[in-house]
Amino acid sequence: PLLRRLNEAMRRRRRPPHPVDAHAGLTVSIDDGTFLDLDAAWHNPLDRRDLLPALSAAGVRTAVLFHDLFPIDHPEWSDRGTRELFPPWADAHLRFDALIVGNSDWTLQRALDRRRGMGLPDPGVSGVVHLSGDGGAGRDEPVAPQGPTPTGARPGLPPQLQTAGASERRLDGYVICVSTLEPRKNHQVLLDAFDLWSQRTPGLGLVFVGRIGWNTEALVRRIERHPLLGSQLFWFAHADDETMRTLLGGATVAAMPSHAEGFGLPVLEALALGVPVVTTNGGALGEVGGDVPLRLAADDSEAWADALVRHLADEDYLRT
């Protein structure tokens, strides 16, 4: 973990400085159109509390797409930079924008509720733009914390996860969880469930696919030091499209135990490949997949273990 943090610090130092100072004297005449902020724009050095009213005064309609408001509602789930930068960015958009869009009904309603709490009426236009999934997640070169790096349904993939060919080490099935490692994603409950099922059902593995996020030092240590890592427990820090599709399509069950989501794209990615899903009702997850996924409490590791093991023995359990 210390070496990883040092490497990340060196990468940040090597990044070129943002050209905001060089551009400070430049001006652009804009008197029409729409300015739309997307994704993690709160890291942009142009303060939206100044930019948005200036654009509005020039006749430009301003708009935003919210993916969630978790840094405001649950700051403990975010890193320090996001906790500091997101609230003023979000509140500026809520105060000045003529168009507010959410990636789910839940996210949109949360944004409108906060705007109303400012004493403001609803914007002139608001709506929802849902995400979509095709089973490929657009991720990079696969990396594992231990052992050789897998590269898909080829010899580099651990034999326990091979879906074709003969292998004495191949598991009977595996549960896959695709998400960044961060507190909100609740990997902890899956590890707790895994520790419950792994001894009595050694044929069922657990696969994590996701990069290291923030506030996860204890979780990463637990994964890296787990005695079953590399035999029944696997972690891919990244996966390219082919590897992702292979791992997800070959899974017995896809699990998403998040405390809350602004949408929940991995649920759609799994369902698109015909993989049963177990998830929660946190945030917008109740909107995703309708009544198809099995939904469990986010903190009940025994219920997760029982449901996942039961599906290994009864393939129709999560399909009915």
What do the predicted segments below correspond to?
Residues 1-320:
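Carbohydrate transferase catalytic cores enriched for Leloir-type hexosyltransferases
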